[in-house]
Amino acid sequence: MNPNQILENLKKELSENEYENYIAILKFNEKQSKADFLVFNAPNELLAKFIQTKYGKKISHFYEVQSGNKASVLIQAQSAKQSSKSTKIDIAHIKAQSTILNPSFTFESFVVGDSNKYAYGACKAISQKDKLGKLYNPIFIYGPTGLGKTHLLQAVGNASLEMGKKVIYATSENFINDFTSNLKNGSLDKFHEKYRNCDVLLIDDVQFLGKTDKIQEEFFFIFNEIKNNDGQIIMTSDNPPNMLKGITERLKSRFAHGIIADITPPQLDTKIAIIRKKCEFNDINLSNDIINYIATSLGDNIREIEGIIISLNAYATILGQEITLELAKSVMKDHIKEKKENITIDDILSLVCKEFNIKPSDVKSNKKTQNIVTARRIVIYLARALTALTMPQLANYFEMKDHTAISHNVKKITEMIENDGSLKAKIEELKNKILVKSQS
C-alpha cells in the first residue's frame, strides 16, 4: 500500500486540526525508504521531533494494519539548512539500532557552553575511527533531564554510523523490554547477538536498569564483552555512578572506570545561543526581545524550550500572524505560572542571604551598606524574574514607599549586571539554584 494513502487514511483516527497541522504536512521520502523502513519529511526539525514522538508509532501501527507488513517509521526534517551529514547515514545501519537515532542530533547542532563543554569534549574526541573504543571508554554523562544528554549520546551515534560502525542506541526501557520479550520467546541468543556484536553501545537513562538482578547481570556481561572487543560504551543518567540506587556495586565500578562528565543547567548566554540555534536551523524568525523573554522566563529544560518554539511557530502558521512578544507571553503564560507558583520570595531571600552571609532582616531594612544594598537588589531582580509578584507587592514586602522604588532598584541592578561579568555569573548561578530547588 502507498504510504501516502496510509497518511490519508489517518484522517479517520485524528481530529481535523491534528491531521491538517501534523499529518497532511508530511511528505513520503521514497528515495530513503525501504520495504520495512518508511521515511517521511516534515517542514522543520522541531515539527519532525514532535510528530515522531506523538505519531510515529501510530503511523507504523496503522501501516501494519492496513498493509499487513511491518515497518519502522522515521520523521525527519526537510530543510535547506539541514546538515548534509544527516542525509548520509546508511539505512542498513539505522535498521540495526534498537531505536532510530534522530539525524538532527549532531555535534554541529549542539550548543557548547560552560555547563556542558567537558561532556561535549569527551564525546567529540572519541568520535573518530582511531579513537572510538580506545580513548575514553566508557563515558558516563549525568545531569538533570532536558539539558542535552541524549543529544550528545546520539551525536556520537550519528558520527559512528557515518564511519560504518554498527550502533545500538537504547533507553533502559528498550533494553529491559528487549530482554523480557526474547526471554519469553526463548530467543535469548538473538538478544545476545544483537547487543554483544555492536561497535558502539549507547544507553540512555541507565539508572532504570536497577529493576531486577537478572537484567543487571545480562547488562554486566554485555558491557564486559563489548569493552573487551574495543567497542565504545556511553551511558547517561540523572546521577553519577556512586549515587545510583538499586544498581549493583560491580556495575557502578564498571560505569566509573572511564570518563564521568556532568551537564549542569546552562547560563543565560548559553540558553540564548540554544534558542538562536533552534530558530536558525528551522527558519523561524524571533526578535531579540522574544528570545530574551523565553530565555529568562523559562527554566533550563531544553526540551521545554523547544516545545515553546514549536508552539509559537504553530500558532503563527495556523493563525497567519507574525510572532510577537505579546503572542509569546500568551503562549507561555501557563508554563511561567506553573513555575512561579513553586517559587516564593522567601526562598529567594534565604538563598541570597546565605550567599552574602547577611541577615534577612538587614536586606528587608532600609540599611544602605553596599553589600546589603546589592543583596536587596538581587532579591528584587530575581523575584521579578522568578515569581508572579507585582512591583507594588514587592514594595510592600520590602516596606518601601511605593513601586517606583522597586523600579529604581531593578534599573540599578540591570546596569550593574551589564557592566560586571562576575556579578552576572553570580546572579545566574543563584537563579539556577532556585529553579533546580523548585523542581525537586
UniProtKB/Swiss-Prot annotation:
Residues 100-316 are annotated as: Domain III, AAA+ region. GO terms for cellular component: cytoplasm; plasma membrane. Residues 1-75 are annotated as: Domain I, interacts with DnaA modulators. It comes from the Bacteria. It is found in: Cytoplasm. Plays an essential role in the initiation and regulation of chromosomal replication. ATP-DnaA binds to the origin of replication (oriC) to initiate formation of the DNA replication initiation complex once per cell cycle. Binds the DnaA box (a 9 base pair repeat at the origin) and separates the double-stranded (ds)DNA. Forms a right-handed helical filament on oriC DNA; dsDNA binds to the exterior of the filament while single-stranded (ss)DNA is stabiized in the filament's interior. This is Chromosomal replication initiator protein DnaA. It comes from Campylobacter jejuni subsp. jejuni serotype O:6 (strain 81116 / NCTC 11828). The gene is dnaA.
